[in-house]
Amino acid sequence: MDIIITAPSLDPEQNVSGVSSVVKFIIDNNKEHYYIHFELGKKDRERGGVFRLFPLLKALRQWRHLLKQTPKALVHYSFPLSAASVIRDSLFMWMVRRQGMKMIVHVHGGLYLTADNIPWLQRCILKKVFSMPVPFVALSNTEVDTIKDKFGAKDVSSLPN
């Protein structure tokens, strides 16, 4: 099976992140599937803010092209609940749903998982994302309960580290 999996760079020289580590582990330990890594997210030394606009637009074009080239692939979408990723990733996930492709959303913690006060826009986006009819995977049973209680998600499973 072809699986498109999103994560920042898997090169530890470029990016030291929990998401990258988990994705690398998944790819390295599931040889029966063909993984297509789609690099999404900034590198550790890369500037953020407005400097991310052009790379993001380029990534959107590449993402659309990849989805059209691999319509039968399963998308394993890595989703950290941080301010920037909530806004960015909701658009990428919407494109997957619009193509009618199967998707699993793998939640990788983040500030908004435990924050009491989430800005209105991000809260609306999160509620919309977690209402999608796709399976969600969290890294612990505590995260599963939090996602269900806080965002109303229905289909959430635990895949502990």
Annotated model-derived regions:
Residues M1-D44, T70, G100:
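N-terminal subdomain of nucleotide-sugar transferases
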Residues T6-S9, F38, S78, H106, ...:
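Short hydrophobic segments within beta-strands
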